[in-house]
Amino acid sequence: MKGTLLLLGLLVTGELSFQTTEACLPFFEGYASVLSGSRVWLYQELQAFNATAEEKVALEKIQDCFSEERIRNILLEPKIMEAMVASPECLSYYGLDNIRSILDYISKLLGE
């Protein structure tokens, strides 16, 4: 299900005529907030996108799913996220220094 949600997010981004490189960081900020298990962080990210009440409830449910397999998600999902953020497209758009600082910040937040 998580892979499906990721694919759906990427497809929607493409259909809305955004460059996926422009959407890299906002997507991963939201993704990291879901992985974190922190409702406060999740609400902060959703506020930036003016999320509706229904969207908040849906993402809370997704966050609960991630929390069920907490150990696996702490170990595996950040590695997947890091691989995607460090994609050649994101690196060329944001620059290596920006990506490094973002990855360091995400690692700190996730307690790695």
UniProtKB/Swiss-Prot annotation:
Record's signal peptide: 1-23
Location in or out of the cell: Secreted
Glycosylation sites: N50
Entry comment describing in which tissues the protein is expressed: Expressed in lacrimal gland, at higher level in males than females. Expressed in the submandibular gland.
InterPro entries: CH2-like, Secretoglobin, Secretoglobin_Domain_sf, Secretoglobin_sf
Gene Ontology cellular-component annotations: extracellular space
Protein name, UniProt field: Secretoglobin family 2B member 20
Spans through the membrane: none
Family: Belongs to the secretoglobin family.
UniProt keyword Plastid present: no
CDD domains membership: Secretoglobin (cd00633)
UniProt superkingdom: Eukaryota
Keywords, sorted A to Z: Allergen, Glycoprotein, Secreted, Signal
Gene giving rise to this polypeptide: Scgb2b20
Pfam families named in the record: Feld-I_B
